[in-house]
Amino acid sequence: MRINGHTRMAAVVAKPIKHSISPLIHNMAFEKTGVNGVYLAWEVEAKDLQASIENIRRYDMFGVNLSMPYKQEVIPYLDELDVSARLIGAVNTVVNKNGILVGYNTDGKGFFKSLPSFAIRGKKMTILGAGGAATAIIAQAALYNAEEIFVFTRQASYEKIVSKMAAISHQTKSRIQVLTLEDADSLQDKINQSDLLVNGTSLGMDGVSMPLPEQLELPSQILVADVIYQPFETPFLKWARNQNVTAVNGLGMLLYQGAEAFELWTGKPMPSQEIWQCLEELYK
């Protein structure tokens, strides 16, 4: 990587963020595409978020990615929001368009791009959880014209999630049904109807927890996906593979949401396959 007077910056803004592999992904992409850029990790306090966003304009940066806890907090400091960011109510990518700061959410697009030979249009999806990553996937599935989306959430969050999903359903004219994770019979019924089952919760990051009861059975044609990429095989994915269905972890989502951001910044496609091979070696 050559850094000179023409090098432009991009960064990921969050707290904590030192653990992020986004700098590895994007700096590899800059190098392989010949784009004169560098990507850093900015660990920013909440009181400094506005100044950090203003620096995008000040230093003519490509833009930034955002992670927790700033995906919603950043919105008042932006000039425009893309349709996906507006629908989800969260931003993970800011693009500097000649001094106009535009917020996008590439998580949902990245997720669906990571699925092998699968298109959600006209299909049914069951998703566990309705937090940030799950909401991005739900909204993108709605924008991609999924036939029906079944959202399972904890009883304690049910009323809040019903309201949130009603807003997405209204804006996209999609069919979204919210049910409780505690209702195992309904969960089995909706899984049986679905083409895609997604774990959108953090359950499994410890290598032990399951987001659903292990006695549930999967139909043979279903595709199973997890948003978690560490561990590489979560208990949820192992459970699915033991039932002989295709199961995909969250590493591809991480890569492809970054690829969407990279192309928005540079106008060039990220060499995703080359970078994927490096990531697989790191995390397998």
UniProtKB/Swiss-Prot annotation:
Q: Would you kindly state one Gene Ontology biological process term found in this protein's UniProt entry?
A: aromatic amino acid family biosynthetic process
User: Where is NADP(+) annotated to bind?
Assistant: 129-133, 227, 250
Residues binding shikimate: 20-22, 67, 92, 107, 229
Q: Which reaction does it catalyse?
A: shikimate + NADP(+) = 3-dehydroshikimate + NADPH + H(+)
Top-level lineage group: Bacteria
Q: What EC number(s) would the UniProt record show?
A: 1.1.1.25
Q: Which SUPFAM superfamilies match?
A: Aminoacid dehydrogenase-like, N-terminal domain (SSF53223), NAD(P)-binding Rossmann-fold domains (SSF51735)
Which Pfam family, any one, appears in the UniProt record?
Answer: SDH_C
Active site per database record: 71 (proton acceptor)
Q: In which pathway does it act?
A: Metabolic intermediate biosynthesis; chorismate biosynthesis; chorismate from D-erythrose 4-phosphate and phosphoenolpyruvate: step 4/7
Keywords, alphabetical:
Amino-acid biosynthesis, Aromatic amino acid biosynthesis, NADP, Oxidoreductase
Q: Which InterPro entries match?
A: Aminoacid_DH-like_N_sf, NAD(P)-bd_dom_sf, SDH_C, Shikimate_DH, Shikimate_DH-bd_N, Shikimate_DH_fam
Q: What class of enzyme is it?
A: oxidoreductase
Single GO MF annotation: NADP binding
Q: Does the keyword Amino-acid biosynthesis apply?
A: yes
Give a short account of what the protein does: Involved in the biosynthesis of the chorismate, which leads to the biosynthesis of aromatic amino acids. Catalyzes the reversible NADPH linked reduction of 3-dehydroshikimate (DHSA) to yield shikimate (SA).
UniProt protein name? Shikimate dehydrogenase (NADP(+))
* Organism of derivation: Streptococcus sanguinis (strain SK36)
